[in-house]
Amino acid sequence: MLTDHFRPQSFNGIDDIVIVGGGLAGLFCALKLAPRPVTILAAAPIGYGASSAWAQGGIAAAMSKGDTFEKHVADTVAAGAGIVDEKMTRMMVAEGPARIHDLLEFGVPFDRDLEGKLLLSREAAHSERRIVRVKGDMAGKSIMEALIAAVRNTPSIRVIEGYVVEELVREGRFISGVIARPDAGQSKSRVSFPARAVVLCSGGVGHLYAVTTNPWEACGQGVGMAARAGAIIADPEFVQFHPTAIDIGKDPAPLATEALRGDGATLINSEGRRFMLDIHPDGELAPRDIVSRGVFAEVQAGRGAFLDCTKAVGRHFPEMFPTVYASCMAAGIDPVRQPIPVTPAVHYHMGGVLTDGEGRTSIDGLWAAGEVTSTGVHGANRLASNSLLEAVVFAARIAENIKGSLPAPKLTAWGDNAGENDDPVTVEDSPPFKVLRQLMSDCVGVVRTRESLTRAIRGIAELERTNKRLRFANIATTAKLIAIAALQRTESRGGHFRADCPDERPEWRRRTYLTLAQAERLAAEVAESEPA
């Protein structure tokens, strides 16, 4: 599907800038690049395949009278478990308020009080109320609706929907374009898009796992593509599990937003006991990794875990949290009167393609923003509502960097050019992908061990050996990077927990940097070793 103002066949000539992905980072970057000509390639209609549109909490920004940049930085560093890049974090936090004002100018209807001031809420591990929201739990949807309208009204932005990017084209040290498959990845032909600059905004890795809150499109293709092109990947072992996905057997799992606990909702087991009080002094508002392990332990013990909102929210649930309310009622659960069954689900990837403060990757010609990246601002455990902030801050910085480093083209030509052919694959329906998802959940999940990680690496290698299609190779590459980095990190920190190494170790108070070549060598060593 294409925007109304452009109907291409296939493409020739050179695009000025190609953005891969139609989520928050991609759309915001395109808008900040205007009037530079930009082509957005999106696997699904923009907004529909993006985790951004599903975000319920909001965007964190230090804007209230009692808040400061220093407090926001301190909270981010504390949540990140010792490996946050403080310089990058200070930059992100300082630019947050300006990006909120950009979003207001693009038409985002953030909640306001009777005097017109922005309403700010508090979420887990934040010391102040600094989350800007829309209608309680509709921030992501409302932000994306506003940006989509702005993009479709910007003549310099061309949106091509239903094109799945499968490969970054590298010529020497440079990325010179991308190759994509039309018809939502189902076409037998592929199309090349040469470009002067490529911005990767392809999202996260949630659907590498059997239980996730992410849309189907978030299956790790972007990280795998970049790694296969030679990019450095950082911190891939750090996967954040949201502790309160609604446990009703849906895929993806609906999310019970962090804001519910911020407003006083409690976590109980089937015996009615608030188990988080025994685990952390902040109880339900402890960092996500700690709450996730607490919920996981109750579920594994057979006691179950439930989010009790009956007293904290009660009859105000429908208007305060309409998205969560609708998900519960559709499953026959009335959250006004009943506790909500919850389970940990993959929600966010702190790791990804390594970028600097301008969004540049380790390969010339390739920038990246959003969840596909690892900027260092999240460390080992992302602070709630910092992800949308990171997306807009670094998307804007990429736009400024490209404007300053690439002179505007005099002419952009479009024509016909059929790409290389290959057999398409519907990733979400393929048996190998289902096997991979279960393998990752079982062996590289909330709790990991040397034995489970070794089993995962061997299982991934077998799946790669028997499945040669390019899209699967990208996805399996990302899974392998996560598992290898998790095996190498012989400690527990943030979103990475090893039952056989349950404590933090000072020698591991550092980030992980990994190339695909290094991961392949380590995987070969695992394959040759004795079974764990």
UniProtKB/Swiss-Prot annotation:
GO cellular component, one term: cytoplasm
Enzyme superclass (EC): oxidoreductase
Keyword Nucleotide-binding attached: yes
SUPFAM superfamilies assigned to the protein according to its UniProt record, in alphabetical order: FAD/NAD(P)-binding domain, Succinate dehydrogenase/fumarate reductase flavoprotein C-terminal domain, Succinate dehydrogenase/fumarate reductase flavoprotein, catalytic domain
GO biological process: 'de novo' NAD biosynthetic process from L-aspartate
Keyword field: Cytoplasm, FAD, Flavoprotein, Nucleotide-binding, Oxidoreductase, Pyridine nucleotide biosynthesis
Matching Pfam families: FAD_binding_2, Succ_DH_flav_C
Gene Ontology molecular function: any one: nucleotide binding
Site, as annotated: Important in orienting the L-aspartate substrate: 123
Highest rank taxon of the organism: Bacteria
Location relative to the cell: Cytoplasm
Catalytic activity of the protein: L-aspartate + O2 = iminosuccinate + H2O2
Annotated FAD binding sites: 22-25, 51-58, 371, 387-388
Active site: 288 (proton donor/acceptor)
Paired cysteines (S-S): none
Family of the protein in this entry: Belongs to the FAD-dependent oxidoreductase 2 family. NadB subfamily.
Function noted in UniProt: Catalyzes the oxidation of L-aspartate to iminoaspartate, the first step in the de novo biosynthesis of NAD(+).
The protein, known as: L-aspartate oxidase
Organism listed in the record: Rhizobium meliloti (strain 1021) (Ensifer meliloti)
Gene: nadB
